[in-house]
């Protein structure tokens, strides 16, 4: 089993790139990502393949998880981990939240089926639009437990086997049957694991007040129709072992979380045989927190530079290195020039608001920094002038000494 994964420091670096390109939006389109992707100097056909692999949900854009996948693929290609773009995503690189989509797409037979349409029109008042096919790690783990507790010897689920679950939900029977028909286009007596997870996800959202969707993604529908995937735990392959963290907030403030009471009666609540093998982005720091971290880090770096410059200036006042017991004026002059150049650059960045100086620092602090650096620059110039005079005097003394001999 591969031990490779995307490290947290990589996620942080990718987030800085993603947030700078997305302008606060949750997705990147091709035009927004083009510059950073082409900086890799990979061929255009390779970048197209990387994009297709990373765009797991097939919406033509990259969310943050998919962007991380694309960047890691590119870095591995550049560093020689792959001779060419792989034909499919490695299991360890698949985001856990989208593992069901990847597995469903692997069931495609080459044709692109149309979306399934539900004939019933849902006119129930008070329901919300915006059904999302995304399964959080906690929800997916719960669906896995319900499936494992009710599957038959072929790894399939019948409609009636979940009757106790239906009884625990605030979902009308007509909506439950509509959801079943949506994931069971062949009208068979049983459904596969993929279809079961989708069915439970629809019921969960309906339980939370969302309308039953009218269509399903094409890749999911293909897996429902094939109904040939072996999901029995004894025969499970590494590529199928996707799971999720079982830690989930169970409070809604108005009713029990989907399936909690049912799983509690079954005695399997909180336990799952699944363990994650892909990359879990569920604990990724949110936008506001990332912005705070970035600004604090930049402020600390700026203060550290100023402190280092102040310390260097103080050490110069105490005298530089020595040659034969005397001051090394050449070294002092060189270091003073370097420090002067550094301070002038810092002063320019502070005045222009460039470099490490960002909008997160207060105007009053910037003014104080500008004044402090300006005073230090003037002091260094005066100090350098005095040292040059001293150096000239020493050279004159050396010449006089040589002539006297």
Swiss-Prot record:
Residues 280-405 form a coiled coil. Ca(2+) binds at residues 55, 57, 59, 61, 66. The keyword Calcium applies. Residues 10-100, 139-227 form the EH domain. One of its GO terms (biological process) is endocytosis. SUPFAM superfamilies: EF-hand (SSF47473). Component of the PAN1 actin cytoskeleton-regulatory complex. Belongs to the END3 family. This is Actin cytoskeleton-regulatory complex protein END3.
């Amino acid at each position: 089993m591969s031990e490779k994964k995307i490290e947290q420091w990589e996620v942080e670096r990718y987030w800085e790139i993603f947030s700078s390109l997305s302008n606060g939006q949750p997705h990147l389109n091709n035009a927004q990502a083009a510059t950073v992707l082409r900086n890799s100097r990979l061929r255009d056909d390779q970048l197209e393949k990387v994009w297709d692999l990373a765009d797991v949900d097939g919406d033509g854009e990259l969310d943050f998880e998919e962007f991380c996948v694309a960047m890691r693929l590119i870095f591995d290609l550049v560093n020689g981990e792959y001779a060419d773009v792989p034909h499919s995503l490695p299991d360890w690189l698949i985001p856990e939240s989208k593992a069901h989509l990847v597995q469903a797409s692997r069931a495609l037979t080459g044709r692109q089926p149309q979306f399934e349409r539900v004939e019933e029109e849902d006119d129930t008042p008070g329901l919300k639009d915006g059904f999302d096919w995304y399964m959080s790690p906690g929800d997916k783990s719960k669906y896995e437990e319900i499936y494992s507790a009710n599957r038959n010897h072929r790894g399939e689920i019948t409609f009636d086997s979940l009757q106790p679950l239906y009884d625990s939900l605030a979902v009308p029977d007509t909506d439950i049957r509509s959801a079943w028909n949506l994931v069971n286009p062949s009208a068979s007596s049983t459904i596969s694991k993929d279809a079961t997870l989708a069915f439970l996800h629809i019921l969960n959202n309906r339980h939370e007040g969302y309308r039953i969707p009218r269509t399903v993604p094409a890749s999911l529908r293909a897996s429902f129709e094939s109904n040939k995937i072996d999901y029995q735990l004894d025969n499970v392959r590494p590529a199928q072992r996707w799971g999720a963290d079982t830690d989930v907030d169970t409070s809604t403030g108005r009713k029990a979380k989907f399936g909690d009471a049912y799983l509690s009666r079954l005695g399997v609540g909180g336990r799952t045989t699944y363990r994650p093998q892909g990359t879990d982005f569920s604990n990724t720091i949110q936008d506001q927190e990332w912005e705070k971290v970035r600004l604090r880090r930049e402020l600390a770096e700026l203060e550290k530079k100023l402190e280092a410059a102040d310390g260097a200036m103080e050490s110069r006042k105490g005298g530089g290195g020595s040659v034969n017991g005397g001051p090394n004026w050449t070294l002092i002059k060189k270091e003073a020039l370097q420090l002067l150049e550094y301070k002038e650059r810092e002063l320019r960045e502070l005045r222009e608001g460039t470099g490490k100086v960002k909008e997160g620092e207060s105007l009053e602090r910037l003014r104080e920094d500008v004044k402090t650096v300006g005073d230090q620059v003037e002091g260094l110039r005066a100090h350098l002038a005095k040292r040059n005079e001293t150096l000239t005097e020493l050279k004159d003394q050396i010449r006089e000494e040589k002539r006297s001999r």
